[in-house]
Amino acid sequence: MSTPTRLYLLWLSGEFELVVCPHLIEELEGVLRRPKFRDLVTPDEVDEFVEIIRRGAISVENPVIIEGVTRDPGDDYLVALAQSADVDYLVAGDKDLTSLATVSPPVLSPAALLDIL
């Protein structure tokens, strides 16, 4: 079973809380609808997955973005979200984020979160 699948199942079972904002939900849906995922998930499966996340996660407003925190300006909102929601960890597979050594909260890869859980 893949690391993302294991984390998803642990989240569904209540092992940790997931915090999202509208911008993150939009990004998730957009990524899952990219051509490279068409052979893996149907549009209906994407709709169902996004709805499960939307219903089950803690939803907060889009954060005030702190610019220049990350190398990719499109990722700055993720750090702002994690900070404004006062979470323990920001979990991301993006190396630009996981390489941030001085950001709070700490950025963990999905595998590192799985190790902690």
Regions found by a protein language model. Name each.
Residues 1-20:
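Short, well-structured N-terminal submotif of metal-dependent ribonuclease cores
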Residues 72-90:
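Acidic, metal-associated active-site segment
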Residues 1, 23-44:
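A short secondary-structure junction motif
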Residues 68-74, 97:
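Acidic, metal-coordinating catalytic cores used for nucleic-acid/nucleotide bond scission
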Residues 84-91, 95-117:
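Acidic, PIN/NYN-like endoribonuclease modules and their adjacent C-terminal/linker elements
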Residues 15, 54, 86-87:
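Residue-level detector of structured alpha->beta connecting loops
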Residues 23-25, 45-69:
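Acidic catalytic patch
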